[in-house]
Amino acid sequence: MKLSAPLLVSLAAFSQAVTALVAFPGAEGFGADAIGGRKGQVYVVTNLNDSGTGSLRDAVSATDRIVVFAVGGVIKISERIVVSKRVTILGQTAPGDGITVYGNGWSFSNADDAIVRYIRIRMGKGGSSGKDAMGIAEGNRMIFDHVSVSWGRDETFSINGDASNITVQNSIIAQGLETHSCGGLIQTDGGVSLFRNLYIDNKTRNPKVKGVNEFTNNVVYNWGGGGGYIAGDSDGQSYANIIGNYFISGPSTSVTAFTRGNANFHGYVDNNYYDPDKDGQLDGSELGVSSSNYGGMAIVSSKYNYPAVAYTMSPAEAVTYVTKYAGASKVRDSVDTQLIAQVQSWGTKGALISDEATMGGPGTLNGGTPAKDTDGDGIPDEAEKQLGTDPNTNDSMKLHSSGYTYLEVWANSLVPSTYH
């Protein structure tokens, strides 16, 4: 059978990746080498239940799994989900409009080698008091790609403590709920990469950074009086690259893009734009390289040698990319659609919220129709025929010549593998 064009392109990309196997084509930064559940078993999520056989909670409760979906829709959870080590979650495999998890938060503490893609995690006011929508306090090598995170009751997405080698890329970190309303703490010496993300409608901590950090091609919109990028505000030493980002003031914004730096925060800065005028046009300008423009941090002249992006966009390119592709963008849900519309109002729309009902809650999703999968190995029969595997034999976890499993080859063919 003739291979489809997307699958042919995907196979070619994987063949080139043999010598330097990253989590998936397009994985970058400190967390790019996460292996997920590649050496384990497949788990197919077959229902939208909070718990039990076939549920997402059950899927991530054991180590060494690649999780795919034969169902789409909103999964309502009452308690936090705790993810085990070496788990891959491939939300792009869900039919219909994909997966939203709503009602409480997730813990990735000690979830070494996690790979998480194309899923929406929306906590909400009914979630655990004082908890993050997503949080990591310990663990090594994790990557989060095209994730939409919102409505945390403490932080929205925080990385703290002994966590190391983490990447968050192509994601949306939105609307931490009032009165706290925080984007997130990024506070570890172990290395965190933040690439091409959107921080939006968080009163403060967009993000608050301490330790070792690469912050490239992000868009920060409508931060509140607590601050946009908060530069440590600490006695601890910090070392960051801050490159090609765009800060756009919105209706809630009353302070400058960078605040609360000091001599302990060492920043290499280059080509960051700031649009403060809320005039309905994207017409910002480059921030001059001075400590005063960057919240009082200590400006350094040489870039830190951290794992960098393959291609550095201009700030304007970053805005175009983020508004089109950030978050669980295979199919944008009603929440992300509203958030992107706020950004594209260029300063005239946006709000800090205390109740997700303001956004219509998590909305409704088309569950779609699962493709036929005779052997139940997570790859639809038609895709197996194209891959050369057997639709009647559970063989999706066999390794392709690229080093990825056939399940990963198929799943990654469903979404773009490059961003430029």
Swiss-Prot record:
* Residues at the catalytic site: 205
- Gene3D superfamilies assigned: Single-stranded right-handed beta-helix, Pectin lyase-like (2.160.20.10)
One GO BP annotation here? polysaccharide catabolic process
Principal EC category: lyase
Positions annotated with a glycan in the UniProt record? 49, 165, 202, 394
Q: Give EC number(s), comma-separated.
A: 4.2.2.2
Q: Which residues form the EF-hand domain?
A: 262-297
> Which SUPFAM superfamilies does the annotation name?
Pectin lyase-like
* Signal sequence region: 1-20
Cofactor binding note: Binds 1 Ca(2+) ion per subunit.
The protein's required cofactors: Ca(2+)
**Which residues does the annotated region (Disordered) include?**
357-395
Residues annotated for Ca(2+) binding in this entry = 275, 277, 279, 281, 286
Q: Which reaction does it catalyse?
A: Eliminative cleavage of (1->4)-alpha-D-galacturonan to give oligosaccharides with 4-deoxy-alpha-D-galact-4-enuronosyl groups at their non-reducing ends
Function noted in UniProt: Pectinolytic enzyme consist of four classes of enzymes: pectin lyase, polygalacturonase, pectin methylesterase and rhamnogalacturonase. Among pectinolytic enzymes, pectin lyase is the most important in depolymerization of pectin, since it cleaves internal glycosidic bonds of highly methylated pectins. Favors pectate, the anion, over pectin, the methyl ester.
Protein family membership = Belongs to the polysaccharide lyase 1 family.
Q: What is this protein called?
A: Probable pectate lyase C
Q: Which gene encodes it?
A: plyC
